[in-house]
From Swiss-Prot:
Lineage: Eukaryota, Viridiplantae, Streptophyta, Embryophyta, Tracheophyta
This protein's name: Vitri peptide A
This protein's record includes keyword Transferase: no
InterPro entries linked: Cyclotide (IPR005535), Cyclotide_bracelet_CS (IPR012323), Cyclotide_sf (IPR036146)
Stated family: Belongs to the cyclotide family. Bracelet subfamily.
Notes on the domains: The presence of a 'disulfide through disulfide knot' structurally defines this protein as a knottin.
Modification after translation (UniProt): This is a cyclic peptide.
Functional summary from the UniProt entry: Probably participates in a plant defense mechanism. Has strong cytotoxic activity against human lymphoma U-937 GTB and human myeloma RPMI-8226/s cell lines.
GO biological process per UniProt: defense response
Length: 30
């Protein structure tokens, strides 16, 4: 539930490397 400061509209979350995932076009962590 914490925004990772990255969007995932066009590309996947690069921040997935630290546990972020795409939700509603924005990368979140927990």
């Amino acid at each position: 539930g914490i925004p990772c400061g990255e969007s995932c509209v066009w590309i996947p979350c690069i921040t997935s490397a630290i546990g972020c995932s795409c939700k509603s076009k924005v990368c979140y962590r927990n």
